[in-house]
Amino acid sequence: MLRNLFRRRLFSCPTKYYFMLLVLSLITFSVLRIHQKPEFFSVRHLELAGDDPYSNVNCTKILQGDPEEIQKVKLEILTVQFKKRPRRTPHDYINMTRDCASFIRTRKYIVEPLTKEEVGFPIAYSIVVHHKIEMLDRLLRAIYMPQNFYCIHVDRKAEESFLAAVQGIASCFDNVFVASQLESVVYASWSRVKADLNCMKDLYRMNANWKYLINLCGMDFPIKTNLEIVRKLKCSTGENNLETEKMPPNKEERWKKRYTVVDGKLTNTGIVKAPPPLKTPLFSGSAYFVVTREYVGYVLENENIQKLMEWAQDTYSPDEFLWATIQRIPEVPGSFPSSNKYDLSDMNAIARFVKWQYFEGHVSNGAPYPPCSGVHVRSVCVFGAGDLSWMLRQHHLFANKFDMDVDPFAIQCLDEHLRHKALENLEH
């Protein structure tokens, strides 16, 4: 009798309620465990700060423009220890990418979308490279998102091990691939345009969902997170964004005479070319663009654009006038009117931040940007750590040039900063 009474009290209404609540809690916990993200996707694991065991640079101070820390970096680069630091080779990447799960985990690629906003606005990338596999890995990791699409064009002259390493990296991702047709790229020749066109075709045919195409080279690096890029592109409201200005007289020789490749170099034949086959005047610009999917479709399919491209194939640096000119043709989706009032300089366009040596100086005295903290190659600044503080205040999406051999700390600090910025809101 006492036992029965005990049972009735044990399973009275309040006790049953708590028991059922406990069971429901256990079921809910089990479901959440099944559907939670993989352990390696934790925010802390994806942070890049402290990732380089050979670096004792304070990136926070670097990004603040601290003169002492910047000078420390410059001195570090001169040391024997720095010059002998371990470097990853193409063969290292070939070996690492044999185990894709390990490669993705150890290299800390982001393999799940961070926000719904980014998922709803996929971006396509054309990346033209020929060497420096470590730099490509850093660039791809910095811009990689699972909802985006990435075409990598490898110069046919590149070493076989480099191509194999790129193919190895691409094989680890469903949305990264090597271009179906590879060109032997010659500086300032049509082959540079053709490399981007090949990726354009592949990207256009493989997926209909991406909104914009951004072209890059192996020495570019983002200065915005993917979410910031998405929001910038949304604000463009279907317009393309690239440098396009009135053609200066000193560049007319580039397209008024015929050029041909001789012994691997572009040579002026002295032969006068016929005028371009279009009513719109030629405009000056750069190789870099941010264009809509509709623009890409028009470029690939329009008969008049095809005629213009055929005409441009024996000119000097056609990439520096072709995209800029197409952007001013009235029928092109997302284009600008041809009036000079609509000219867009490299500093006003968002496609790329580049420092030219002959424009550098004191901003307070009217220069567009301060002096280069790194070195110059063909009058272009290869950025150093001292360039980051000013650069990150600009509106551009990417900057050029960065080089692991010149200043890896500039890339390291920028990489860490962008990754932390992308992840900092996920824990809240």
UniProtKB/Swiss-Prot annotation:
Mediates interaction with GOLPH3 and is necessary and sufficient for localization to the Golgi: annotated span: 5-9
Tissue expression: Expressed in kidney, liver, stomach, spleen, lung and brain.
Entry protein name: Beta-1,3-galactosyl-O-glycosyl-glycoprotein beta-1,6-N-acetylglucosaminyltransferase
UniProt keywords, alphabetically: Disulfide bond, Glycoprotein, Glycosyltransferase, Golgi apparatus, Membrane, Nucleotide-binding, Signal-anchor, Transferase, Transmembrane, Transmembrane helix
Annotated residues for binding of UDP-N-acetyl-alpha-D-glucosamine: V128, V129, H130, D155, R156, K157, Y187, R378, K401
Cited InterPro entries: Glyco_trans_14
Active site: E320 (nucleophile)
Phenotype of null mutants: Deficient mice show normal organogenesis and fertility. The loss of core 2 O-glycans on leukocytes is associated with leukocytosis and impaired neutrophil recruitment at the inflammatory site, while lymphocyte homing to peripheral lymphoid organs is not affected.
One Gene Ontology MF term: beta-1,3-galactosyl-O-glycosyl-glycoprotein beta-1,6-N-acetylglucosaminyltransferase activity
Glycan attachment residues as annotated in the record: N58, N95
Job description of the protein: Glycosyltransferase that catalyzes the transfer of an N-acetylglucosamine (GlcNAc) moiety in beta1-6 linkage from UDP-GlcNAc onto mucin-type core 1 O-glycan to form the branched mucin-type core 2 O-glycan. The catalysis is metal ion-independent and occurs with inversion of the anomeric configuration of sugar donor. Selectively involved in synthesis of mucin-type core 2 O-glycans that serve as scaffolds for the display of selectin ligand sialyl Lewis X epitope by myeloid cells, with an impact on homeostasis and recruitment to inflammatory sites. Can also act on glycolipid substrates.
Species annotation: Mus musculus
Enzyme class: transferase
Lumenal face of the membrane: 33-428
Regulation: Inactivated by thiol-reactive agents. Inhibited by free UDP.
Pathway annotation: Protein modification; protein glycosylation; Glycolipid biosynthesis
Binding-site positions, a glycoprotein: E243, N250, K251, R254, E320, K341, Y358
Entry EC number(s): 2.4.1.102
